[in-house]
Each structure stands twice: as structure tokens, then as C-alpha cells.
Amino acid sequence: MANQRIAFTEWTPDLAGVAENLSVAKNVVPTALGYNPFPTAVNYSAAASENLNNVFAGKFSATTNIFAGGATKLFKLDGATLAMNNVSKTGNYSAIVKWNFAQFGNTIIAANNVNKLQSYTLGSSTLFDDLNVDAPVAKYVAVVRDFVVAANLDSGSNANKVQWSNINDETNWTVGATSQSDYQIISDGGNITGMTGGEIGLIFLDRAIVRMSYIGSPLFFQFDTISRNVGCVEGNSVVQYGSMTYFLGADGFYSCDGTNVTAIGTQKVDAWFYANANQSKLNLMSSTIDPIRKIVVWEFIDNFAQNTLLIYNWQVNKWSYCTTDVDVVASSASAGMTLEGLDLYGNMDTLTTSLDDALWTGGKFLFAGARDDRVVTFTGANSDAQITTGDIGGETTSVVTLARPIVDNGSGSVAIASRMLLNAVPQLGSYTAADSENRVSLRSSGNYHRLSVIPTGSNWSNAIGIDIDVTPQGAR
């Protein structure tokens, strides 16, 4: 009998099951050593008057302001009551749209591809209104250096056009000798499908990526194509953290640092994503960054109408996935909560989030989103996780007799699938919980074995691997 330790390495569904990687990494977060639990979503706000399709956190002085967009309205969270107040332009908005947000100074700017850019000045506005009579109608908005930049204009009539405001003046969109406001039409690459800002701007098109760099008068901005083959298929997949931007291309997931475009999903998750995602609903994707966990999260609808999260840890280049009932993922920040305000969530015994959590501290980053008509935060209990290995063995027939899950602050239930030939479909048996000595008795014979672990214990923190006892068996 031999003891063998199987580490929970990378999840690579695009590779054959005989690879020394995982076949399932569900409802977990990838780390350098194993996987951490993925938290469930809990309601943060009261109900808005319609379902939400984006969430954005703006900050003015020391005050965090949370905004959200619905099909026909814009909302602002009341930090004291958690009510979602309608702060739309008078009369609301007639079209069913998805919102894109940016902050320039103390002004929140929202784009919906139907109305002129909308603005809300933190500290003084009570409602959104047109940014300016000359402001464009845009699908995307970002801030590049000291300019507000709009892209894919006029409800798609100028889908390859970029326009920017005057320097340090988001209200001035007049092109002329006394203004640095201007525009650029990108002639090749297709329609603009996304944009990010910062020191430089990145313009994503169907079949290209263009870098937007400030060079001063008389041209103001220089536009350089950094990719003529790889573009972005869905703007809602574009998400930025620091100098890095992550996005979905026609053949998979990429990162871009402003100069280089790098494939991050090749031979890992690209084929899995396109096989599982509902292609007709990619426009309903959302994406965000969790800088604390160092992950990018893409939300999409799969072929069975299930909301699914695809998770990428950029520090260790590992992936996982989750199922969720959340419609939109977003980065947000807490508005802060007094002990009296906690009454809005029920009594101390019914709180699903620890009082030590950043949720209750104003201005702290929150991995958030929206579920129906409420803002939610991913600060709840651990999701029900499952981690399944690839095939182990293959040289001779063997019997797995014992398993010991390696789970920090917890244990696990174990199931096994054994088969003689690779053309047989692996079928997991029933899960058996580990006993008080963290042992699961098994007796499963085959040439190839897969072990599946469901981590248990409400406070389990890291699933590292599984130890098994294996006995060789002669073929008959």
C-alpha cells in the first residue's frame, strides 16, 4: 500500500482529464496554494423601483456615494437608510439601457448610448442632468489624463468615433481654436466595443486595440494601433486595474498593459467558456476586480440560463468558476453603518456578515453587484464548493482504500470515480463525510481514479489537496 498526496493545482477544463490538473474547481477562489472559499452574496441596499444593471462607487472628500443604473432610472444609495433613491434626470429615461459610469473630479458621469452624457455633482446635485447641451450621446465613457472621453457615439451611428472634452473641463465639448476638445474616427478595426482610461486610454474595437496618448497641441491625442488581430467582442467584459486591462476576445480572454496583449485563457478556460456561455446573451455580461483577493471576475449566463462567474487570479495565473443568483458584478465601497443602522439588517443573531467585516466600515472596498432590484455584497457565508481532480494512475490497476481531505479549519466529504479505460465516462459515487479522524473509507478499483472533495465546516479557509491510500491490484 502506498500513500499519495494529490495537490489541488490548476483548474484547466480545456485540457484532457489525464492532465495533472483539476477537472472541477467550483465555488472557490484560486490561490497560490489550493483554493479559498467563495462567499455568497447578501443584500446591502433596500429595493430600488426597478432591477439594476450596474453599480458604481464615487467618492467626494471622505464620503462614499454608491450609484446604480436600471433600465430607465439612475439611483443613489442613502447611506443612512439604505434606500435606493431615484436621482434620474426629470422624467427618467425612456429607453431600456445599460449604464456605463466614470468619475471626473467631483462629477459622476453616466453613459447609456441613448441620451446625452448625464452628470451628477457630488455634494451639490440632487438629480442627474445632461452634462452639457454639446455633450455627445455615447455608449462608453472614461477619463484619460485631464479629459473626459466618450466612445461609440450617437446611438451607434458613429460607432468608431472617439470624442473628448476640453482639458480639465468636462462641460466643454466645443471643437475650436480656444479648446482642446476634439474627436477622432478610427477607420479600421470595426466598431468600438469598450474603453478604459488613466494616463493613457485604450480603445477596444471588434478587431483591434488602439492606444490613446496625450501629446499636446495641435493634435492633442495620438492614436496608435497596438493590435490588429485581437479585439474585444463585448464591452461589458472590459475591466481595468491599475495599468492592466482584461477583456474577452473572439477566441478567449486576454490582458493588455497598454503595449502588449497577452492571452491568459489559452489551453485553460477559453474553450470551456465558449462551450458553456450563451452566445446570444454575451451583451448581459458584467465584470469587475476584487483587488483584495487579486481576482478578475466575469459574470455571464450559461446555456442553462444559470448566472455563472469565471474567476481569474492574476498573481498566480489560476482560474475557477462559481454559480450565483447575482445578475451583475461590480466594485463598490461601503457607505458605513452605525450600530443603530444595523437594525436595518435585523438583530445581531440574524446578521450573515461578521461585525469585523469591511462591509460596516465606510469607504472600504467591497466586491459587490446587483441581484434583481438590490445592491448586494459578496460578504456572506461560504458557498457550497466542489473540487475534483483529473485522472490519477493509468499504469496498472489499483484500489483506492482511504482518503483524507486537506482542508484548513475544516474537513470534507469525498467521492470517487474509477474506470478501467479512458473511453469510459467517469461516474462519481456518493459523497461520504470524513470521520472524526478526518478519514474516508473507500474501496474503488480501476486504472484511472478521480477524487472529488466538498469542503465542510462553516469556517473552512483553504482546500489544499487530498491524501489517498492506494494498493496495486493485478488485472484478471
Where do the language-model regions lie?
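Beta-propeller and closely related beta-pinwheel folds
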Residues: 40-52, 85-95, 125-284
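Short beta-strand element of the conserved SAM-dependent methyltransferase core
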Residues: 68, 110, 119-120, 203, ...
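Short beta-strand/turn micro-motifs composed of small residues
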Residues: 70, 112, 152, 205, ...
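Hydrophobic or amphipathic alpha-helical targeting/insertion segments
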Residues: 98-133
